[in-house]
């Protein structure tokens, strides 16, 4: 099923339900993008978001200098945000609020390294004009006109891609006389939670999960981990129950 996490990041915020895509949904979403002539240009940013768990501003602010493909790491040291300052809406660079936000994370999925390597190779040809912001340059992710990508841009893309995928999947399922495997409604924040879910399913090293996710508070990581493992236990119990007979 789709996991829900009843914890918002950061203390003092109301509890919210946050879904994580299942492994099947994740695969279907990325495969659809990679095969789509209309949406394939969205593949690099979606793969990096889903494969690193970066916050959206950490990802859209990534520069060529933040990526070390020899050591398979990404340095997270600034955010790209879009907000109104002095009555003018524009992009700004901010630095992480807490020490845990500044971190070097391992690249865990080979697909992330592949997408980043390909992007770095073509970026000079793709973007002849370098964007410079607060001394940062060599930004990896740009919109169609070569400017910065916003969370709003990515959310609109997710929505359009999901609608297109679901329409195609419903037609295909009808042809094959089966139940369609549809994507739920989700946004860019669910991509981070999806990564965190896969990480929690793969390791019980809470400190490692906290460092990769950049959670300031250990209890945030612990709450998410506990919730995800409980959900998994429920699913496993249902499967096993069907096979157990005492008498």
Q: What label would you give each PLM region?
A:
Residues 1, 69, 78, 82-85, ...:
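Proline-centered turn/helix-capping motifs that create local helix->coil transitions or kinks
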Residues 1-56, 60-62, 70, 100-102, ...:
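Basic, Lys/Arg- and aromatic-enriched nucleic-acid-binding interface segment
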Residues 5, 71, 82-84, 90-102, ...:
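C-terminal secondary-structure termini that scaffold catalytic or DNA-interacting sites
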Residues 15, 73-75, 84, 94-118, ...:
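C-terminal catalytic core of Y-nucleophile DNA break-rejoin enzymes
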Residues 20, 57-61, 148-154, 190, ...:
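Gram-positive cell-envelope targeting signals
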Residues 31-42, 52, 105, 124-131, ...:
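Short, basic (Lys/Arg/His-rich) helix/loop patches that form interaction surfaces
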Residues 66-73, 204-224:
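Short, polar N-cap/turn motifs at the start of nucleic acid-interacting alpha helices
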Residues 80, 194, 213-239:
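Catalytic-site neighborhood detector that most strongly recognizes the C-terminal catalytic loop/helix
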């Amino acid at each position: 099923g789709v996991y829900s996490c009843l914890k918002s990041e950061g203390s003092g915020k109301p509890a919210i339900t946050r879904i994580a895509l299942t492994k099947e949904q994740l695969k279907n979403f990325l495969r659809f993008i990679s095969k789509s002539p209309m949406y394939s240009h969205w593949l690099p940013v979606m793969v990096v978001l889903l494969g690193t768990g970066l916050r959206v501003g950490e990802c859209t602010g990534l520069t060529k200098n933040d990526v070390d493909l020899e050591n398979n790491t990404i340095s997270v040291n600034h955010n790209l945000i879009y907000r109104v300052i002095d009555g003018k809406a524009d992009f700004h660079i901010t630095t992480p609020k807490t020490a845990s936000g500044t971190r070097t994370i391992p690249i865990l999925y080979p697909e992330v390294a592949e997408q980043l390597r390909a992007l770095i190779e073509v970026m000079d040809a793709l973007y002849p004009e370098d964007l410079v912001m607060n001394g940062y340059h060599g930004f990896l992710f740009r919109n169609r006109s070569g400017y910065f990508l916003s969370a709003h841009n990515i959310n609109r893309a997710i929505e359009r891609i999901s609608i297109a995928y679901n329409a195609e999947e419903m037609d295909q399922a009808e042809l094959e006389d089966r139940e369609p495997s549809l994507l739920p409604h989700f946004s860019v924040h669910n991509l981070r939670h999806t990564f965190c879910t896969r990480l929690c399913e793969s390791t019980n090293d809470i400190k490692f999960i906290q460092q990769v996710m950049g959670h300031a508070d250990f209890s945030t990581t612990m709450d998410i981990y506990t919730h995800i493992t409980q959900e998994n236990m429920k699913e496993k119990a249902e499967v096993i129950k069907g096979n157990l007979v005492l008498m």
